[in-house]
């Protein structure tokens, strides 16, 4: 089965073709970072218009690189939510329209299910069940995964997502957009121990997260200290350390609560090298395993949508002809396969 995947939930246009026997045949990605940089964040209207311009050319390029024609495809998968409603409607409209004109089945894919299943694209893919930490600019949640569609949310952010906290703190430090990766780069020059940030919501039971207070703590720390390069690096290190420690503490709790030994980390923040280092160390101590997507599949991409959509289409999940987008779509409302 060969599936065309389309991802347009935010500020990246992703298109890919996945074959259930040969694996990933092609993968195209266009980032809108430069388009939104002057605004310091994603402008929904600009994002939608750019998806309109880029999606069809990327589909043509993906087919060309895979050496395929539309007649060689078995289905189309598109991100239907959660995300920016205008951006989602672009991908959904194109996906449904092409499916109708090419005589193919189409399926709407949950964006976070795509992230959760992204490690399945790797040679060393995790077996079910596992605990998944989905950590990105828009979401931070802990999920117990028994199978595809069998998701129980164990905890989630009550305010800012981890990636959002990274970007907002980077902005406070005067770093360019998108600031999260730049803050992490600056933290590499930082000194451990000079500043101590709190580990929010780790002093009480539960698996929910809160990162807005860290942003406020960072703002106060920045104002109270000199603006030299080393101080900035030390603050960046302390902030990143606090976020990662908090995530690690919650992961350890989730694994203990569920009795599972496999941990999946996915979403944009899963590309963070310090996070990978610390959670890798944690799982070694716990005699467990940790799984990540390759770095290029941590951010939004069409490959994860093609893979997730393939699983749904194999299960005979088809959508009606209407074009629908779901800006808010709880992942635990998805249907398990074959149920």
From Swiss-Prot:
GO cellular component terms listed in the entry, alphabetical order: cytoplasm
Subcellular location: Cytoplasm
Swiss-Prot/TrEMBL catalytic activity: L-threonylcarbamoyladenylate + adenosine(37) in tRNA = N(6)-L-threonylcarbamoyladenosine(37) in tRNA + AMP + H(+)
PROSITE patterns found in the cross-reference section: GLYCOPROTEASE
InterPro entries linked to this entry: ATPase_NBD, Gcp-like_dom, KAE1/TsaD, Peptidase_M22_CS, TsaD
Gene Ontology molecular function: iron ion binding; N(6)-L-threonylcarbamoyladenine synthase activity
Gene3D superfamilies (UniProt xref): 3.30.420.40
Cofactor annotation: Fe(2+)
Pfam families: TsaD
Binding site for substrate: 134-138, 167, 180, 272
Binding note for cofactor: Binds 1 Fe(2+) ion per subunit.
Binding residues annotated for Fe cation, in chain numbering: 111, 115, 300
Function comment: Required for the formation of a threonylcarbamoyl group on adenosine at position 37 (t(6)A37) in tRNAs that read codons beginning with adenine. Is involved in the transfer of the threonylcarbamoyl moiety of threonylcarbamoyl-AMP (TC-AMP) to the N6 group of A37, together with TsaE and TsaB. TsaD likely plays a direct catalytic role in this reaction.
PANTHER family named in the record: TRNA N6-ADENOSINE THREONYLCARBAMOYLTRANSFERASE, TRNA N6-ADENOSINE THREONYLCARBAMOYLTRANSFERASE, MITOCHONDRIAL
Protein family: Belongs to the KAE1 / TsaD family.
NCBIfam families: gcp_kae1, T6A_TsaD_YgjD
Record protein name field: tRNA N6-adenosine threonylcarbamoyltransferase
Organism: Photobacterium profundum (strain SS9)
């Amino acid at each position: 089965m060969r599936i065309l995947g389309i991802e347009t939930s935010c500020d990246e246009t992703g298109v890919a073709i996945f074959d259930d026997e040969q694996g990933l045949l092609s993968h195209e990605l266009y980032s809108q970072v430069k388009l939104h940089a002057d605004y310091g964040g994603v402008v929904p209207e600009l994002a939608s218009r750019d998806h309109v311009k880029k999606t069809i050319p990327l589909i043509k390029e993906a087919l060309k690189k895979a050496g395929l024609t539309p007649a060689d495809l078995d289905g189309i998968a598109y991100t239907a939510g959660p995300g920016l409603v205008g951006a989602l409607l672009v991908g959904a409209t194109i996906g449904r329209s092409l499916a109708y004109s090419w005589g193919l089945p189409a399926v709407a894919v949950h964006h976070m299910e795509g992230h959760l299943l992204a490690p399945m694209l790797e040679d060393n893919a995790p077996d079910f069940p596992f605990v998944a930490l989905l950590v990105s600019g828009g979401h931070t949640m802990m999920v117990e995964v028994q199978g595809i569609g069998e998701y129980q949310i164990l905890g989630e952010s009550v305010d800012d997502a981890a990636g959002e906290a990274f970007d907002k703190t980077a902005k406070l430090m005067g770093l360019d957009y998108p600031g999260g990766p730049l803050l992490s780069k600056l933290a590499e020059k930082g000194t451990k121990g000079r500043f101590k940030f709190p580990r929010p919501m780790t002093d009480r039971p539960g698996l929910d997260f809160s990162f807005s207070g860290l942003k406020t703590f960072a703002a106060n720390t920045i104002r109270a200290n000199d603006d030299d390069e080393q101080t900035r690096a030390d603050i960046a290190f302390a902030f990143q350390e606090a976020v990662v420690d908090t995530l690690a503490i919650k992961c350890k709790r989730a694994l203990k609560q569920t009795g599972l030994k496999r941990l999946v980390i996915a979403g944009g923040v899963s590309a963070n090298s310090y996070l990978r280092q610390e959670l890798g160390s944690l799982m070694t101590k716990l005699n467990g395993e940790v799984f990540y997507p390759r770095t290029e599949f941590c951010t939004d991409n069409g490959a994860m949508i093609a893979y997730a959509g393939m699983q749904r289409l194999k299960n005979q999940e088809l959508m009606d002809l209407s074009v629908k987008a779901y800006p808010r779509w709880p992942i635990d409302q998805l249907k398990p396969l074959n149920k």
